[in-house]
Amino acid sequence: MIPRAIRSAAAASFLLLACVAGHAEPVVAQRFMVVAAHPLAARAGYDAIRRGGNAIDAAIAVELVLGLVEPQSSGLGGGAFLLHYAARDAKLEAYDGRETAPARAAPGRFLGADGRPLDWPDAVVSGKSVGVPGLLRLLELAHRGHGKLPWASLFEPAIKLAREGFPISPRLNALVAADRFLALDANARRYFFLPDGKAKPAGTLLKNPDYAAVLARVAAGGADAFYRGEIAREIAAAVRSHKRGPGDLVEADFSAYSAKQREPLCGAYRRWKVCGMPPPSSGGFAVLQILGILERFDLRALKPDSVEAAHLFAESGRLAYADRNLYIGDPDFVRAPLAALLEPRYLAARAKLIDPLHSMGRARAGDPGGVATSYGLAEPLELPATSHVSIVDAEGNAVALTASVEAAFGNRQMVRGFFLNNELTDFSWVPEEDGKPVANRVEAKKRPRSSMAPTLVFDEKGKLTMVIGSPGGHSIINYVALTIVNVLDWGMDIQQAIDAPRMGSRNGPTELERGTKAERLAPALERMGHSVRIRPEASGLHGIVRTATGWAGGADSRREGVALGD
């Protein structure tokens, strides 16, 4: 049977894997929907559900293929966050597969001998940036709790593609060609480049037998095949022998790693319930804060592309990012006052700080009252490269999965067919500010703060209404919050909401998406006191919305994703 998404686009484009633009209209389906960043990955999830699998099965199949065909964004060498909704008992679960710092990590990890932060390449393109990968432990934990299809069967699509080959997509080709560090790694150079040093062109059939071999071992032996033994030893040795900056990862760090189940973070937005990831991700918290502040304003009376709407969204973002930067860190190390920071009276007080006619500039973190904090404020480097998957299966179960290796191609080190993460640069590089320890400072076995924001939205009757998430570094929070507003307040369909111009603030300049209608707002915003920055936006939003007859899926036209449904 031909998936609906293929019916709505040229079948030849799907089969040749040309760059797939977002549809002008959302893809509609009655039974289930899979939205992912690459057609082959989405197809793996689609096929898993067609074989009788559920949302968890599909998510595993999708992510294993993404690690092959979109290796710059996520993979076995990285981590992930996953929200799962079980329709039968209306149960929501959050899975944390965030990377951890090695046991030998210390707060001054990214400081030089002079006490100043290291230069970008010396921190990122090095062994120091690599944390213990968490993806496979997360997928295994979720499958043990909810999977229907055999674990090994979910690896088959990715193994087959890795052995037989897949065409290099235009986006992957462009990213490889533009990266000045990738060819420094011998494995990556052999894989992606021609003998003359040029990147292999788009359309080239790329085979990855090393990746297939790793997947085959994990399919047969579970995640232990990755975390205990030869593979873990090889990764740790590669990190410790990095020429630019050796790391301190050892095999024992792998065997000690575990993914965690956490309590989802939920809050009200008008008549809806919005749920996201708790810390160590700041995504769920900050999205809820932005929405909670915006709830005090009548957004429906404004046009989505108006100066007034852009002003309110940017100012709400400033306030949320200010609190995020001060309070949020790994909950095993940092006790953030989440309930107080999301309390309606606190958010109402924060909303009153917004002047409808003038920007507040840089916002200061709030004090919810009765909360003692001794944390300093410092912000990590932004390195956006991530992937998001949204799935609703035939039983109404849902998955929102956001996975990452941090920067594009992680630390640029390829081991056994996949890239290692550089997630430890998500820690704050400066461990103290004004004599106070920073909540997100580096510590042994700690998980760095993330901005990933896999999100589920429910209506007033508790029915699943929306599945959404995005890549994009620190901007993920703004991307997800604005898309939710586009759907819930301004009545856009999911494809319109995703493709709408990006705008917002991360408590710095007000950012407007280059080449869109948002650019036109710059002069008026500047007159209101905004410092405006016009830039391309790296969102890769993938979403699903309930309709009267089933589901509508949307994939971000800024990337190569598709929605497949039946």
What spans do the regions from the language model cover?
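Bacterial N-terminal signal peptides
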Residues: 9-19
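Short, small/polar residue-rich loop motifs at catalytic or cofactor-binding pockets
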Residues: 261, 383-386, 450-452
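Extended C-terminal subregions enriched in glycine
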Residues: 395, 445-447, 480, 489-537
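Short, well-structured alpha-helical segments that form the helix of a local strand-helix-strand
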Residues: 58-63, 152-163, 233-236, 304-321, ...
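Active-site rim segments in enzyme catalytic domains, especially the processed small/beta chain
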Residues: 68-75, 79-85, 89-94, 245-250, ...
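Noncatalytic scaffold domains of N-terminal-nucleophile
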Residues: 24-43, 47, 55-221, 226-228, ...
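Internal maturation/activation junctions in enzymes
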Residues: 296-404, 556
